[in-house]
Amino acid sequence: MPVYPREGKIIQIHSYKHNGTIHRIWQETVVLKGTPSYVIGGNNKTLVMEADGRTWVTREPAICFFHAKHWFNIIAMIREDGVYYYCNLSSPFVWDEEALKYIDYDLDIKVFPDMTYMLLDEDEYERHRREMHYPDVIDRILKNNVQKLIGWIKERKGPFAPEFIDKWYGVFQAYQT
């Protein structure tokens, strides 16, 4: 059994909180590339279900990047005025044939088309760190990964490289025809 989904497979993405409760489910994402190290997916107007049962639909095409070793995932949203990124500080992904899964650790970085960025939800992170008893080692890992992610943004590395989005959005569009 592979530890990653195969290309072309339509999968769900499940986000959990540290205490094991479901946080959010994305219903349909097509796998554009699956390896033991990373998964790249694409979706557009996919149904999302929140933990409380509310649902909404994504507004634009997105390319998603999940890594098996880094404590973050990256969603590139393709909009009329450019590519916006939403980066979740999270556990590395796991794949169990049901869904691609990760633990959401509250901290987020929003990146604008001009590559300026904002660290978000620090208050929520501190509150959940106390309430859910995040171990100190997790706190250190996450703070180190915030710095790693900022480095990637500044260097335009990985998903932040323009050619990355161009390539994978093209692959995603081919699946849509």
Swiss-Prot record:
Q: Name one GO molecular function term.
A: ribonucleoside triphosphate phosphatase activity
Q: Which InterPro entries match?
A: DUF402, FomD-like_sf, Ntdp-like, SA1684
The domain of life for this entry's organism is Bacteria
Binding residues for Mg(2+) 1, per the UniProt record? Answer: N88, D104, D108
Q: Which reaction does it catalyse?
A: a ribonucleoside 5'-triphosphate + H2O = a ribonucleoside 5'-diphosphate + phosphate + H(+); a ribonucleoside 5'-diphosphate + H2O = a ribonucleoside 5'-phosphate + phosphate + H(+)
What family is this protein classified in? Belongs to the Ntdp family.
Tell me, in a sentence or two, what this protein's role is: Has nucleoside phosphatase activity towards nucleoside triphosphates and nucleoside diphosphates.
Active-site residues, Swiss-Prot/TrEMBL? R24 (proton donor)
Q: Locate the residues binding Mg(2+) 2.
A: D106, D108, D121, E124
The cofactor named in the record is: Mg(2+)
* Species the sequence originates in: Geobacillus kaustophilus (strain HTA426)
Q: What is this protein called?
A: Nucleoside triphosphate/diphosphate phosphatase
**Short name of one Pfam family:** DUF402
Sorted keywords for this record are:
Hydrolase, Magnesium, Metal-binding
Query: EC annotation?
Result: 3.6.1.15, 3.6.1.6
